Amino acid sequence: MGADVTLADIARLCDAFYIGGTKVGAFCGEAVVFTKPGLDDHFFTLMKKRGALLAKGRFLGLQFDVLFGQEDGELRYQRIGRHAVELAQRIAEGFRAKGYELAIDSPTNQQFVILD
């Protein structure tokens, strides 16, 4: 269950996209990815001008440097994400075993338990 779209597919099909970090343990933030040279020419200036650039943004960006590193032949980001999904599925199974209903059958690390 889940999507069969790879990161390479997204990069091939999009001019720009973002990758969130909090669900894989990052303190906060998203990494914005531009797939073609020149698309990011004024991005930094626009972010700064609109007040969306954090003073410690470089420090926060280091999280992604670590998350996008290799560990045992795969991206650390993917390994952590897969582990989070596996644990969420176990939590969902535990709720079902106790008689709770889930709003949807989620293939992600977000589970929506009905607590009525």
Which stretches of residues belong to each language-model region?
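Active-site C-terminal subdomain of aminotransferase-like
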Residues: G2-T108, L115
